[in-house]
Amino acid sequence: MKLVNDTAVAVDQLGMRQGAVAVYLDVWHKDLPEFLQLRTNNGDDRMKAHDIFPAVCYPDLFWRMAKRDLNQQWHLFCPNEIMTVKGYCLEDYYGEEWEQRYMDCVNDSRLSKRSMGIKDIVRLILRSAVETGTPFTFNRDTVNRANPNAHRGIIYCSNLCTEIAQNMSSIETVSTEICTEDGDTVVVKTIRPGDFVVCNLASLSLGHLPLEDEKQMKEKVATVVRALDNVIELNFYPIPFAQITNHRYRSIGLGASGYHHALAVRGIRWESEEHLSFMDKVFERINYAAIAASSELAKEKGAYHYFEGSDWQTGAYFIKRGYNSPEWKALAVKVSTQGMRNAYLLAIAPTSSTSIIAGTTAGTDPVMKRFFLEEKKGAMLPRVAPALSDKTYWIYKSAYLTDQTWSIRAAGIRQLHIDQAQSLNLYITNEFTLRQVLNLYLLAWECGVKTVYYVRSKSLEVEECESCAS
């Protein structure tokens, strides 16, 4: 872990931008307690890796047990020992099959295990989250149940920003031969490339789009889908594994920014049922347009390599999400006939920097402040929430003052229409108890949210009323 940490620090794009690495660990891994303290300020500094972003993969079983009784025991194992003794990798399974194999490991006396109370594990997770903002959350069973390409593999984890959820597999050396070529001795390796996931991202600026106009939205979404598909051909690939995977799956990540902006200009409050209903329709419309556009591209250029047998081809994708209207049924038939150009379509990235350039709000988060000063190259630049006026001022409620259950419920509604995941931040104050933070995690799991990004904490003690300050 130290080596990974130092690599992230060393690879800094010629001093312009420090590298960043997210490390995902299963919640049943034997080293979990130490892993959860990688970035905390207390403890042995030799065991720290402050420049790594830790993330934890959770099965449904863990959250069910945490909800039912925190005093239950949870058992941690060494994955290598499981492979040696049992002959399988526990991480290669999910859902009911994973639970059966996990309980088989629990009951096998040949395996050494580290047992802890779920309460103790949850306490470590939440303390780290409140203190450092991490670990990120990856709900493994939720992700893999919704995977439209489960026929080709499994999704083990997400990326640095928790919005990517695509099949992945390891790069394997099949054989190594020592040969002689032109009098020289050479080593020839035969390598199986695996699935090396690549991000091809773009975002719709919701605050600047006519979201109610179905025709215009279809046109704009289709344009972005085509552009992202072209990026796959035009891109520079520093390693061949990335190129191979990108051309096999042709995965893209169409996202969204300006979410709070779009609500504010329509006078829709974040903490309202109107918000949930409106964005449910918006993201269903975006999803429909993206699928239709990808299918048209498949008709024009051909389907992605693994389309046959996918949920797109069988129609299971539409059935799982309850898309039963005549329009959706017609699209399902069209997709089954024409194919899909892209294996994965939607992923909501954080867009914290690009949203400022676009003059809108970041990702799907509420604004942190209505106005603030941003430091850029030694200068302080004033920034204000987009379209800030007497009509939108009170609509722009600070993220730290917003009831986070509304943000999570909204994420759950959006998730139905997003085949990958979302960069969902939780905003808490020092007044939150650990139990309240745990309840947010449980609510996210219950709402079908696949991932949780940062837990951003802030004290309210020195806050001044913005409308009264002068």
Predicted regions and their residues:
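Active-site cavity-forming subdomains of large catalytic enzyme subunits
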Residues: M1-S203, P210-L211, Y237, F241, ...
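A structural-propensity feature for long, helix-poor, extended segments
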Residues: M1-V21, P193-V198, L211-F236, I291-S295, ...
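Internal maturation/activation junctions in enzymes
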Residues: M16, K220-Q243, R269-T351, L440
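Glycine- and acidic
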Residues: R17-A22, G43-D44, D104-L111, V186, ...
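A glycine-rich phosphate-binding loop feature that marks nucleotide/adenosyl-phosphate handling sites
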Residues: V23-D31, V56-C57, P79-G87, N139-H151, ...
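Core structural elements
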Residues: V27, D31, V225-L234, T245-G267
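Catalytic alpha/beta core of large soluble enzyme barrels
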Residues: T162-Q166, L228, I232-E233, Y317, ...
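Active-site-adjacent structural elements in folded domains
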Residues: D184-K189, P238-Y249, A262-R266, A330-L331, ...
